[in-house]
Amino acid sequence: MTVPVFYSISDDFTKYAAVSLNSLVKHANPETDYTVYFLNQDLSGQHKQDLSDLGIQNVHVKFFHIDDDIAKLYNTELGNNLFGACTDSSIQYVAKMVKYIKDVLALDPKKYINSGMLVMNSKAFRDEHFINHFMNLLERYHFDCIAPDQDYLNEIGEGRILHLDPRWDAMPNENTKPLKNPGLIDYNLFFKPWHFKNVQYEDYFWQSAKETKFYNELKAELNNYTDAERADDREKLNHMLLKEDKTEQDPNNWTRVKEREAVKL
């Protein structure tokens, strides 16, 4: 069995991808074969080599922080579900976001998933023409969304999402205690350990970073990131949430469209 793994990165994200790939290699089952594909447009030759050098005999590099053998995740039985994902724990204590999910998306916030990590039922996507359905919705309504890809996936997949153990998409959240055994860490939105100190789960990132050639560069990036830049990141999050007021009044928001036609597959 070969487990395919896909990354989508630009050249400037190489150092972060290298930390993740190194962690994957360290936790890979030696009895399983893995092929890691990097989807890219502008990776330099040197960075391709840097990533290739991290491969081992059973992890081949072909161009959400991984702390377990992801073959366990890949082997999830999806049944008739379109994809498997974890509930988005990062929004449960954000009142504006909870209101947006209830009033604009007409979904249950406790079932709203994070799209940063998906186990996809590719056959169902093809057989049921998921992409055609998505493009039809996009072209007809172009919904104004706070989290575009995530909102579309939640809406189209409603009722056919397998909710996975939260350890497979552990997200830093100052309102909750960290999971004791995270399998995959998603440094969601703006609070990255290479920009902010004391980020939940940061130890996993730096432990893996030390084993790559980018450790000193990443540390320098953290130390050079200014308080003004951190304040700007926080303001970007607040700006995102302002969309809730606007979209609630939109005559073609998800709630109103769903009253007229089927959105989910």
PLM features per residue range, with description:
Residues 1-9, 13-19, 114-115, 120-265:
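A glycosyltransferase accessory/donor-loop signature
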Residues 3, 32-36, 61:
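Residue-level recognition of the N-termini of beta-strands and the immediately preceding loop/turn
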Residues 16-19, 46-50, 69-70, 95-96, ...:
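A short acidic (Asp/Glu
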Residues 23-32:
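Short, acidic, metal-binding catalytic loop of nucleotide-sugar glycosyltransferases
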Residues 34-42, 85-87:
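Short internal beta-strands
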Residues 40-67, 72:
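Active-site-proximal specificity loops/subdomain of glycosyltransferases
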Residues 68-102:
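Conserved donor-nucleotide/metal-binding helix-loop-beta segment in metal-dependent transferases, i.e.
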Residues 105-117:
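A recurrent flexible, glycine/aromatic-enriched loop bordering the glycosyltransferase active site
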